Amino acid sequence: MQLTSLGFLFVLLPVGGLIYYFLRGAGRRRFLLWYSLLFVGLLSPLCLLLLLAVMVPDYLLARYIAMAHPRARSILLGCVIKDISLAVVCSILTELDKLILPVGISIAAFTSVGYLIDLYHGECDPIDDPIRYGVFCSFFGKLYIGPIVSAQQFVPQLDDPQMTAEGITRGMVQHLRGLAKIVILAGSLQELITQWETLLSLEVTILGTWLHVLCYIFYIYSVSYTHLRAHETVLDL
């Protein structure tokens, strides 16, 4: 399921927004966690397993880092190596066409790594509640392609969400702008990039290479998942 698919736009997102709106307190946080895990599971059961492999060990070991355990540095290093290795292996397998990219694994991994490093340096408070930690790592509004946010930025929003009619309207406008860019620009640019890569495989020139790079940069911008994420974040937080 993609952020631009009909199932996400007209079923998963609006239904989730309505349920979240009528819930209160801890019920909202629990719902966000299970809904985010559902989103990942619909993408791929493998994605869900990899996501849990990132979150569960890091949550359990974070308490030792927060308590300044004598082996806190070693624990932190082990978690960092585990998360980065998982993200790198997934990327390599994807490049080799051995695996469809597990959406959100890299985002979740680096989100968790950032939290553990901040915790080790005393720059944030430990997230004792597993529900809060789970939402922090797996919230579907940012899991697809970021952004990577710190615990100091994200967790307070779970305790004091600001969901207003004005924010929802602004988010819907952002989402429509993002969809328009994807439909109008991204498809054409992707076809152009594919044709350009074929030409470059026959004859490589400096001008052709730079034009290909610029075209690809503009394609990444025109995909506009940032606009889509902004909309979902306004709706849910």
What positions do the PLM features span?
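Membrane-embedded transmembrane alpha-helical bundles that form the catalytic cores
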Residues: 1-235
